[in-house]
């Protein structure tokens, strides 16, 4: 995916300026008003590309919940492009704290050069500028890259817009057909990776975003783990693991993977060396141990286990030693997912109210004090589950289900929410959707 060339672009001095950043951990924040101006273009075709780039940048920033793009209908200044200093008073008049100017040009190579500058309209300073050289078909990724740069400059955290989501697509009509699908983080460029002839579950990205793994049931009793190369489309069977029901999760270095396998009435966590295919059993005793997830440094594994009666969350060293419980609230816990930052673990929690099951998505500290209940529920519903993290550890994606009504089957959709429990949004997909997995930022 190394098709984007990136350059820093500085036209005006930044000397002596320090920007106050947004910290979303402080709770709900007022979105920063930003004007994304029309991009200059060297042709009518590139004018259309520029308009599309502006739309993607604005949408990315709006989706984050931290920015409020201002409608172009209120713009006063008509000058566009990156080779002039804006009339800042005109932008302040429409309450734009930030201004984005840009341009799109075609190079002799046939590639597009997409440039931008981000301005602070009150201090009248350039904050950042950059240009991207991309094949024409990758203009959308360049727009995501620009939004990433803006997000990082203002928040201090890396952006997450130039990413992919792999998930299970579900037809809404009966009988339900499930297929592995891939899309941009915002739902664009959706494509199907499997044909729907077999039951498929739990797609996972490998060490990079170039490959995925998933479970497919060739028969009702036989599950196979498949590897699919997203560049070539080539697919191969990784293993025929009797008793496996979820795809493996991979270590940060890509050399190992963990999975749960049921044998002899118990389900245990196993680690596999991907080079030698050697399996190492990490848990013991009786009970069901499932949903392992590595810490960002690969030294720890979080998982859920019912060995003490009710499913709770536990952390152990990656060799299976030093097991300790980290969940202490009421209810049962499932599907833990370790934040890429290493500070939090997301989870599904099932509680009961008036005899009805309630599903919750929550987060807790990865390293709480002894018996500290550090968890915080951020959303609840009829069936919310399968949390996963954005690569910057600031947003959680999950699936939400609705029950069947009359002759209409139930449906599942994918949503995002920030770690404070605000800004819940649906990710639009062509059909039902569940089991999302978020890629790292693309190269």
Swiss-Prot record:
Keywords: Cell cycle, Cell division, Periplasm, Signal
Membrane spanning stretches: none
A Pfam short name: TolB_N
Signal peptide region: 1-18
UniProt cross-references to InterPro entries, sorted A to Z: 6-blade_b-propeller_TolB-like, PD40, Tol-Pal_TolB, TolB_N
Cellular compartments annotated: Periplasm
Gene Ontology cellular-component annotations: periplasmic space
Gene3D superfamilies: TolB, C-terminal domain (2.120.10.30), TolB, N-terminal domain (3.40.50.10070)
GO terms under biological process: cell division; protein import
Assembly mode: The Tol-Pal system is composed of five core proteins: the inner membrane proteins TolA, TolQ and TolR, the periplasmic protein TolB and the outer membrane protein Pal. They form a network linking the inner and outer membranes and the peptidoglycan layer.
Family annotation (HAMAP family): TolB (MF_00671)
Function text: Part of the Tol-Pal system, which plays a role in outer membrane invagination during cell division and is important for maintaining outer membrane integrity.
Family stated for the protein in its record: Belongs to the TolB family.
Protein's name according to its UniProt entry: Tol-Pal system protein TolB
Originating gene: tolB
């Amino acid at each position: 995916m190394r098709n984007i060339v990136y350059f820093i672009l500085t036209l005006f001095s930044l000397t002596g300026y320090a920007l106050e950043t947004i910290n979303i951990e402080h709770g709900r924040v007022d979105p920063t008003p930003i004007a994304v101006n029309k991009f200059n273009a060297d042709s009518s075709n590139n004018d259309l590309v520029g308009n599309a780039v502006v739309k993607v940048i604005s949408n990315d920033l709006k989706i984050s919940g931290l920015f409020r793009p201002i409608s172009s209908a209120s713009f006063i200044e008509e000058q566009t492009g990156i080779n002039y200093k804006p009339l800042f008073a005109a932008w302040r008049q429409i309450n734009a704290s930030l201004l984005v100017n840009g341009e799109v040009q075609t190079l002799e190579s046939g590639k597009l050069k997409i440039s931008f500058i981000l301005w602070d309209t009150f201090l009248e300073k350039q904050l950042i500028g950059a240009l991207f050289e991309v094949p024409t078909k990758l203009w959308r990724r360049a727009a995501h890259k620009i939004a990433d740069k803006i997000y990082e400059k203002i928040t201090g955290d890396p952006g997450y817009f130039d990413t992919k989501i792999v998930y299970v697509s579900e037809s809404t009509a009966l009988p339900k057909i499930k297929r592995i699908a891939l899309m941009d983080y915002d739902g664009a460029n959706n494509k199907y990776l499997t044909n729907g002839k077999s039951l498929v579950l739990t797609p996972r990205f490998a060490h990079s975003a170039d490959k995925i793994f998933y479970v497919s049931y060739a028969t009702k009793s036989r599950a196979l783990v498949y590897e699919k190369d997203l560049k070539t489309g080539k697919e191969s069977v990784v293993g025929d693991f009797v008793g496996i029901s979820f795809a493996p999760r991979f270590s940060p270095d890509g050399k190992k993977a963990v999975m749960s396998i049921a044998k002899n009435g118990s389900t245990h966590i196993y680690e596999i060396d991907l080079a030698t295919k050697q399996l190492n059993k990490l848990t013991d005793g009786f009970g069901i141990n499932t949903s392992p997830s590595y810490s960002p440094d690969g030294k720890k594994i979080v998982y859920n286990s019912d060995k003490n009666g009710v499913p709770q969350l536990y952390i152990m060293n990656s060799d299976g030693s030093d097991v300790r419980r980290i969940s202490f609230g009421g209810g049962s816990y499932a599907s833990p997912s370790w934040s890429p930052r290493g500070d939090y673990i997301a989870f599904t929690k099932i509680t009961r109210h008036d005899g009805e099951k309630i599903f919750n998505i929550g987060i807790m500290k990865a390293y709480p004090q002894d018996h500290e209940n550090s968890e915080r529920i951020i959303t609840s519903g009829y069936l919310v589950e399968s949390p996963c993290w954005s690569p910057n550890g600031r947003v959680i994606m999950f699936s939400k289900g609705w029950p069947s009504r009359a002759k209409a089957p139930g449906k599942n959709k994918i949503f995002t929410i920030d770690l404070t429990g605000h800004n819940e949004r649906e990710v639009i997909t062509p059909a039902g959707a569940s089991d999302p997995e978020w890629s790292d930022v693309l190269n």
